[in-house]
Regions:
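Short strand-turn-strand beta-turns centered on an Asx-Gly dipeptide
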Residues: 145-148
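Flexible glycine-rich active-site/ligand-binding loops centered on an Asp-His dyad
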Residues: 152-177
Length: 186
């Protein structure tokens, strides 16, 4: 069997983005109940990088509706392989740049740098470790590693919309993951 064929088979075998971890069907952020909108696995080539879940007040099927929905939101992650904090921060930066207009990215440069500093401050995410992002209107976005908040809330609604576009934008980190996040609970 030729190498391209083997690679294609490996990629196809991971074609569904079902998660390794079962995420809770509901959570609460700032006293507001949120529902699991969808969950999936981020692949980098054929390797599983992390499982991810998106929680919203009401289920949606489109990226535009998820981004536009008001109220608190939450993104939860479970690392599936060792990833350096710097690599994770840089991947977020690339995702922000690829999915947001430059003027908006420049406007939120301070928050973006703080986000990168949070992940770069951790030498590596180990398999099984968790991280999350919670957005609360009029407060901002709080980042959590292993359930512990990493500093004060950052940014505003527009900043969290930028963050959501990493996975829901026109050039998402992983198309299968985007589809899974918008597919509804398993």
């Amino acid at each position: 069997m030729r190498l391209p064929t083997v690679a294609a088979l490996l990629i196809a075998s991971g074609a569904n983005a079902q998660t390794s971890k079962a995420f809770e069907k509901a959570t609460t952020v700032a006293g507001v109940p949120l529902q699991l909108n969808g969950s999936g696995t981020r692949f980098k080539v054929v390797f599983k990088v992390y499982d991810m879940a998106m929680y919203l007040r009401a289920p949606v099927k489109t990226a535009e509706a998820a981004i536009a929905q008001g109220g608190p939101k939450k993104l939860s992650f479970v690392a599936l392989r060792k990833v350096s904090g710097t690599d994770l921060g840089l991947a977020f930066m690339r995702g922000l740049d690829a999915n947001n207009p430059r003027d908006i990215s420049r406007k939120h440069l301070t928050e973006t740098n703080q986000l990168i500093a949070i992940f770069s401050g951790k030498s590596a995410m180990q398999p099984g470790e968790t991280f999350a992002m919670e957005y609360v209107p009029d407060q901002g976005t709080t980042f959590f590693i292993q359930g512990q908040p990493q500093g004060k809330p950052l940014g505003d609604a527009e900043f969290f919309e930028m963050v959501l576009r990493i996975w829901l934008g026109p050039s998402p980190a992983d198309w299968r993951l985007k589809d899974a996040l918008l597919s509804g609970p398993p």
